[in-house]
Amino acid sequence: MKQSIIQALRKEFETLEMKSGEGVFDYFSRVMSVANKMRVHGKQMRDVTIVEKILRSLSDKFNYIVCSIEESKDSDLLSINELQSSLIVH
């Protein structure tokens, strides 16, 4: 049972994408909600996994910001809060 819940949450996490017109805060809330559910059920979710997922799944209007972040910062060292702050500023 637990494994099937984790599998369902993993699929939900992998298919998450920012919706057209969705704000940064709302998208981060959706991603973190799924990630936290996975953690509750025993799945290890490193921050870098979440940061990379968010960078890959933002809407096209953030492409130039994502490129800038990837060039200037090591995504392994970027916290979720730092990423959110960087995106909100833009």
Question: Which residues fall in each region the model found?
Answer:
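Intrinsically disordered, low-complexity linkers and tails enriched in Lys/Ser/Pro/Gly that lie
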Residues: 1-90
